[in-house]
């Protein structure tokens, strides 16, 4: 068991993270199940490789910066009419959901596997955004203001958040020749899909944020 985990953990984590990217928006239950498997695999690998794990100082400083940000955000969760609910959302968004970074930083060392995860993310975002545009054109299952959320029943705000996150990343990957050709092509496809997706999503915030980022990056 130990030798199998040490030998295959990198590939298993790569596959699980890719599957999670492709399933969470359409099925939260399945996405959370896969996410739990990622955390479990990470914990098992940490135990078996506990004497080998080392975190570079360059990464540690970002970790401490993130902890500082959490301490700054935490009071906003505590100053609420329903502290139980806001605290739950705080830990879900800023702690639980961020744990996926750990296996990527600690155990996925192959650049090919990292590029594969990035390509999967770009392709998925392109398809997700195109589905929102199709929903908008067909008038299917639209939210308030005629806005589309993508993936049939996707969240409008969730899509807007992902568009704001993914658009500048895809723009950088498309322009940076250091990335492999297939990553840059997936980024270009993602950019095309996300432009149409922003049209379907009708989020003024995503248009404004991505417009500013587009000018700054290019």
Residue spans of the language-model regions?
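Membrane-embedded alpha-helical segments of multi-pass membrane proteins
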Residues: 29-48, 91-102, 158-167, 208-215
């Amino acid at each position: 068991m130990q030798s199998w985990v040490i030998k295959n953990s990198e590939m298993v984590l790569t596959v699980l993270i890719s599957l999670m990217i492709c399933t969470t928006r359409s099925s939260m239950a399945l996405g959370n199940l896969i996410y739990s498997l990622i955390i479990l695999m990470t914990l098992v690998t940490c135990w078996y490789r506990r004497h080998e794990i080392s975190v570079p100082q360059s990464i540690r400083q970002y970790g401490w910066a993130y902890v500082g940000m959490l301490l700054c955000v935490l009071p906003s969760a505590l100053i609420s009419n329903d502290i139980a609910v806001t605290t739950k959302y705080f830990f879900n968004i800023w702690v639980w959901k961020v744990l996926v970074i750990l296996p990527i930083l600690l155990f996925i060392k192959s650049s090919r596997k990292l590029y594969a995860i990035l390509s999967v993310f770009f392709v998925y975002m392109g398809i997700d955004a195109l589905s929102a545009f199709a929903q908008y054109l067909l008038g299917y299952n639209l939210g308030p203001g005629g806005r589309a959320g993508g993936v049939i029943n996707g969240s409008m705000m969730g899509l807007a958040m992902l568009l704001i996150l993914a658009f500048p990343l895809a723009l950088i990957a498309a322009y940076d020749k250091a990335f492999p050709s297939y990553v840059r092509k997936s980024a270009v496809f993602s950019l095309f899909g996300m432009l149409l997706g922003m049209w379907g999503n009708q989020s003024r915030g995503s248009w404004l944020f991505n417009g500013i980022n587009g000018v700054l990056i290019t």
